[in-house]
């Protein structure tokens, strides 16, 4: 099996916790030498995940594409932030904009596409709404301008708990228990999908992210009165719809048929305004499709390679 190269991009903005130059990690799946650089796919994960989530998709794309799977700040091998309240979407967008500009500097004629799961899709919407940064094609995986409040609360129940486990098996079982929305997977798939989420220290297994990523999130979902929090979410939805309506590139929307975060009504509206995303639903899946199943991979592959 092909393995990616772990690379780092120095980024500005919020300081790193260790006081040095902050670095954003990304996994570089290089394409065939003859196709190198001509088609780049940037993949960005969900709120508490990391770039190796895209291993299966990347291996399917690398015959014709170079895939860059990012560890967003505070996740995986990217630096942790000195200020926990800096774990905000705007800072993530700035970091990813730096990567887009770096790729365009390295390969000026490259076609750059974007695949974003959940939070990675929100970052992608903000990038795609800016003509100077917009990808050629955009894939939004189970996310849109309207994010359902119960889903936010569900995620807030486990985000940042920082549990540790006596064995890798126990850690994998825990991750599976909080990820039932991902749909059915074999034990081997759960293990492969979970291993990059873990790190071993002092004989225990820990989640491979900064628990402090939860602080801004919990300030919204548990730190406000419900009325104020809901108003905050509604204001955010207006902003996200404005971003979505500004997108002018072909857009594919993936949705788990049982998703509690992206409703069918929101998906339908996304097909009628802005880039008029084409929606593909996957039965037996909630939030969010993992892009491990062959049918999920094929839909993305066909969309990105269509041009």
Region spans (language model):
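Conserved hydrolase catalytic core segment
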Residues: 109-149
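Short beta-to-alpha linker loops that shape the active-site pocket of alpha/beta-hydrolase fold enzymes
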Residues: 71-76, 144, 283-286
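Conserved HGGG/HGGXW glycine-rich cap/lid loop of the alpha/beta-hydrolase fold
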Residues: 28-80
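Catalytic histidine-centered segment of alpha/beta-hydrolase-like enzymes
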Residues: 285-294
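Conserved alpha/beta-hydrolase catalytic His-Asp/Glu region
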Residues: 166-224
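Active-site loop/oxyanion-hole signature of alpha/beta-hydrolase fold enzymes
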Residues: 19-22, 32-33, 56, 72-115, ...
